[in-house]
């Protein structure tokens, strides 16, 4: 599970760095490419889960789901902290669809979303790269 923690943290940092880069490039202004560029951040968990599955085998499907939960939870905690800092400190006036964004709710949504994504993504990635657990 060490790699699940490491790759989860890496995903959180990479996603946060991408969000800051989007801000610096002016993508978070209304009606810009920022409406779509955020979807590129979905590549970070895909790539990290691929390397996690390749380099840290598990013996059962239940452990694979656990590995996904750890991966997602750590990524969500790190990413949620970055999201909170972004909306609370760097861009507090950010508005989406005409309403300002609450930093705490955005961080919680990021954490829960990352946890769900991790639980689903790691076992699915195991199927695609044929790194199946031996039993269970």
Cite the ranges covered by each PLM segment.
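Membrane-helix interface/capping segments
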Residues: 52-64
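Internal alpha-helical transmembrane segments of multi-pass membrane proteins, especially GPCRs
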Residues: 5-10, 66, 70, 104, ...
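Hydrophobic alpha-helical transmembrane segments
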Residues: 100-120
